[in-house]
């Protein structure tokens, strides 16, 4: 999400005039997608600034948020926001509807689990639809069971498990077609 990160607008060519517009759009999209009791896994680079900025954002977001730390989050560990999350960690393995999922801020070519049976969801890179954007060239070796859940790649909205399943199944099918 990169809340309060002014440079990300220019760096990633985000379609916002300023930080306030970006924050408000993402908060609105989030709350229109996520219910009060929904579980959210945020894959890092949540917010820049200190505990005041983090608190302003967290006070407005729906859901029970698990934070997988990103490179921009590490320096804020001491700021007092950690207790606002359900859990804060560097990585996480979860299972949803019998689907094993590995969560990390970074994409990995080697990760814990079988590449056909385990999904890997990540952030960090700033791609857009159809594998475009500033980091797209570096991602050409990803497995079809991996996906960038970052906001630039998902219309500045959270992605549900049902949406993920459709996306990853489509990526797997596209690879099968290419291999034939």
Report each predicted region and the residues it spans.
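Core catalytic region of metal-dependent phosphoesterases/phosphodiesterases
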Residues: 3-96
């Amino acid at each position: 999400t990169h809340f309060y990160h002014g440079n990300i607008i220019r760096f990633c060519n985000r379609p916002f005039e300023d930080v306030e517009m970006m924050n408000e759009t993402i908060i609105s999209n989030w709350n229109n997608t996520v219910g009060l009791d929904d579980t959210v896994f945020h894959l890092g680079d949540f917010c820049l600034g200190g505990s005041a900025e983090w608190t302003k954002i967290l006070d407005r977001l729906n859901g029970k948020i698990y934070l997988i730390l990103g490179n921009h989050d590490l320096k804020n560990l001491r700021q007092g926001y950690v207790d606002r999350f359900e859990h804060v960690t560097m990585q996480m393995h979860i299972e949803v509807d019998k689907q094993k999922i590995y969560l990390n801020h970074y994409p990995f070519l080697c990760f814990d689990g079988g590449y056909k049976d385990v999904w890997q969801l990540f952030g960090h890179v700033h791609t857009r639809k159809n594998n475009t954007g500033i980091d797209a060239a570096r991602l050409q070796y990803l497995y079809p069971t991996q996906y960038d859940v970052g906001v630039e790649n998902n219309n500045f909205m959270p992605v549900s498990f049902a949406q993920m399943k459709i996306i990853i199944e489509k990526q797997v099918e596209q690879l099968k077609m290419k291999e034939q």
